[in-house]
Structures are given as structure tokens and as C-alpha cells.
């Protein structure tokens, strides 16, 4: 059975006799390649060749995501000015303009100024969303299928859910949280516009050939506390899932922050799985808490990324790998919560491959 077939069988809840090991090593590879610090063994390899050498599957968002196409109105114009490490993008629309400032390093980007700061900015963002269209690029999808082959099933992650998009992309945490209390009417309307505008995206995904759909939300309970989660996020999760399930899709969100306060709601959101729940010491939950909260909901990932740091005892990696298999298999796509660090020991990924190959399930 190929990794692709195994991947699909897990989400279709068909019998499986193997553990699917699907770590995300892309950031490790990209940073070390850019810095010239790839280990000698991998220096001449492509990313997929490294995956193959390590004996593991790939979670191929990066290959399939570009099949999602989002186009703004022709009357929207973006103007970029670069000054040293700072790039300033001014978005001009018939409703007004938005300004975003990013600071760049050789391997990363940080937002210095978010585009939405005032109620007037909210209205401009709403205009952009109301005039945006989504379509699926079949040619890109077919090329991605050829690139990935049998290494994994096709999958994508879709734009963040309402609150997480506001907190991470549009306003930032401080301004976004403040605005919810200072401008509740305007923020309620923005959330409603985001939800409605997402319908075009949901129709595009529902009509696409991709079966496995991730909600790339980066949920953290500090950004999305239970009262906010249950009021704005959970109802939209349920609505999205009903639409995509009717189209035969399998869904899961990306919860890579502290989520102990949100786990009690995990089974009520209508997901097939949940990705990237981060155990202690980096997150705030134990694997036992995750097991008890999820029931038969599929866990994607599970092994703390700290276990892949060179200074950490190898015994912890072995123990947590075996716990994940014991607690969650067959409802498991084993991975790293959230991904291996650029300074991680890549040979520990190979060790997990060997454990999975010998696992009796």
C-alpha cells in the first residue's frame, strides 16, 4: 500500500495496518538550504528526495495550495515600496486604501503594521472581500499530482477562519481584540462579511477533486479564548464542515497554539481530525488529555517538536512516538507538532520512520 492510499484510507476510516508517518520538514530544509547548512548527506537533494531518503510521507500543502486562485477586482491596485528590510504595500480600492508594512530577514518575514486599524479600514477590507472571486486551477492541481505521486494524498489548506484571520492577517492581536470591544457593530459586520465572502471559496473547494481539506487557522486560545471561539468560530466551523462534508471532503483545523481550554469543544465542531495540537513542554496539554478529548477524531501530528532538538534525550522521542501510536492509531496521521526546527536533528525523523515500520497495529 502506498503512502497516498494509506493517507486516504485513514480519512475514509477504512482498515489500515500501518502507521502513516508524515512529518513537516519543509521549514528545516528551506532554512538550511538558504543558509548553506544542510547536512552533507542532503546537500545535493531536493526536498522530496530528502523525504524519500528518510522513508516518510509528505504533507503536500505547498504543492497543491496554488491550485486555489483568489482574484481581487480589477479596480484593486497594489503598490509596493521597499526600503532596506521594510516593504510597504499600499492597496488602493474605490472604497479607500490600506497600508501594510513587513520587515524581512533572509529567511523570515514579520508584520510591522497591519492593514486594518480603524472602522474606515474595516469598510475598505469588506469592499475587497465582497469583490474577490475564487476559482480552481486544474492544471496546477494535475502538475502537483505528478510532483507528489504516491507520497501522499492531495490536500490543501484554505484561508483562516474569521477571528484568526482578523488576529493574524488583518489587525493583529492587540488592535483586533480592542476593536471587538470598542467597535462591536463594525467588527460583527466584518466577521459576517468574511463568512459570506468565504462561500465562494467553499464552493470552489467543494467542486474540486481534492478530498482532504485543512483549515489553516493557527488557533491559539490566547488569540481566540473560549467565549470568542464559541460565539464566532465554532458556528462557522460547523457551517463550513456541513458544506464540505456534503461534497465528500474530509476536514481538520490547524491548532498549533495552546488549546487546553478549547479541547472540550473539539468533538462538537464537526471535524474529521485536528492537526498540530502541541503537547507539553511547548504547548499546554499532555498526550493523555488530547486522547481523552478527541475520542475517535483523527490526530494529525502529536510528537512534540522539542523531541527533535539535538540536546533533548532520545528516549523522550521514542516514548512519545510510541504513546501516539498506542493512543491514537488507527485514527492517526503521525507527525511533528508543529514541525521540526531548522536546528533540529533530521536523523531523528529517520528513527521515527524505523519505529513506524516495526509497529504492530
Give the role of each language-model region.
Residues 75-131, 151:
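A contiguous, low-structure linker/loop signature
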Residues 31-72, 76:
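Segments that shape or occlude catalytic/ligand-binding pockets
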